[in-house]
Amino acid sequence: VIPQMDPVFVTCDFVKGTIDMAYHAQEWELNPENIMHGGIISTALDTSMGFLAHYYTHLSAPTVVTVTMNVTFLKPVLAGDIFHIKCQLDSLGRTLATVKAEVRLERDDILAGIATATFMAVNE
């Protein structure tokens, strides 16, 4: 499903521990309420936060897996909205990385959601 979501890399700052990825809300991602399905938003969050976690843990292990993820939805994402997943590395240990993220709509810079996740570096 991730290729169909067509994520766009916007920025990454290794020193600050941040990444920004953009997504375009598409018709197929809407739920019966005609807003973006929370599971699709969660997939975008997991993908973006996991990408950042992998960036910092890839030297210790080739794979990173999601251990926990907590998402809070604040505002709806509508069809056609462009939204950014802005991630920040919160902590980094030997095998665990914790990342926090915001879902921000381009229209009026609306905060649509927040999330935190912990990822584990594994050697498969």
Task: For every predicted segment, state its role.
Residues 1-28:
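Non-catalytic linker/capping segments at the edges of enzyme domains
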Residues 5, 15-19, 63-69, 81-83, ...:
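A generic structural signal for short beta-strands and their flanking turns/coil linkers
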Residues 20-52:
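Hot-dog-fold acyl-thioester-processing enzymes
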Residues 23-25, 73, 121:
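Hydrophobic residues in beta-strands and at strand termini
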Residues 39, 43, 47, 68-73, ...:
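Hydrophobic alpha-helical segments of small multi-pass membrane proteins
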Residues 51-84:
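Hydrophobic beta-strand-centered segment that forms part of the acyl-chain substrate-binding groove
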Residues 77-79, 84, 88-124:
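HotDog/MaoC-like acyl-thioester-processing domains
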